[in-house]
């Protein structure tokens, strides 16, 4: 009897400390799946070895009036924001992407949806080559999307790169 009680206690205590089950992947017909697919399409278009990008596909992912906002911490820690249309981003990024490999991918994603609006917070890592062990940059992309007809379109991408004084908080890093 004591052995049985000890085994039950051991089983209960190890299951209490076991990792929680992973969340199920979104169903292909769900809004979350469509939203995450749109966000991943943005990452896929801008990522690749040095060379051309599919800018028509990139622009098709955005809603009319969409904006991309990059932030940079300057002297004294003051943040500046560079607001661009998708076309302005394309003009600024084309030369860099033609000459340099750039691979950016999300390592953690959080999606919130209400009716026809969505917010996606992705922690990203950037590499010059898909074979690079360590990223040259990490940060957070904040995507806002809107449902237009049957499609989810990007309305805003707002991002900030981490730095020594502003590391990515643990809650936005991949769960280990």
Where are these regions (language model features)?
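Positively charged n-region of N-terminal signal peptides that target proteins for export
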Residues: 1-4
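N-terminal, post-signal-peptide region of Sec/Tat-exported proteins
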Residues: 50-78
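Short, low-complexity N-terminal intrinsically disordered segments enriched in polar/charged residues
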Residues: 18-61, 173-176
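Hydrophobic h-region of N-terminal signal peptides that target proteins for export
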Residues: 10-18
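A short, polar/proline- and glycine-enriched secondary-structure boundary/capping micro-motif
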Residues: 79-82, 131-134, 164-171
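Surface-exposed, charged secondary-structure patches
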Residues: 67-68, 80-131
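Short beta-strand edge/turn micro-motifs at domain boundaries
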Residues: 19, 119, 138-167
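Hydrophobic pocket/interface hotspot
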Residues: 42, 58, 66, 120, ...
């Amino acid at each position: 009897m004591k052995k049985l009680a000890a085994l039950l206690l051991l089983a209960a205590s190890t299951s209490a400390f076991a990792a929680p089950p992973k969340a199920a992947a979104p169903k292909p017909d769900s809004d979350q799946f469509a939203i995450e697919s749109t966000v991943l399409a943005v990452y896929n278009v801008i990522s690749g070895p040095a060379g051309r990008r599919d800018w028509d596909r990139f622009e098709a992912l955005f809603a009319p009036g969409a904006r991309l906002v990059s932030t940079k911490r300057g002297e004294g820690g003051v943040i500046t924001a560079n607001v661009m249309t998708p076309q302005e981003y394309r003009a600024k990024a084309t030369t860099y992407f033609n000459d340099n490999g750039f691979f950016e991918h999300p390592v953690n994603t959080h999606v919130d949806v209400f009716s026809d609006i969505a917010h996606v917070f992705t922690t990203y890592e950037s590499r010059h080559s898909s074979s690079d062990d360590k990223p040259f940059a990490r940060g957070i992309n904040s995507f806002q999307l809107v449902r237009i007809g049957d499609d989810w379109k990007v309305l805003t991408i707002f991002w900030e790169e981490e730095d020594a004084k502003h590391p990515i908080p643990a809650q936005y890093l991949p769960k280990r």
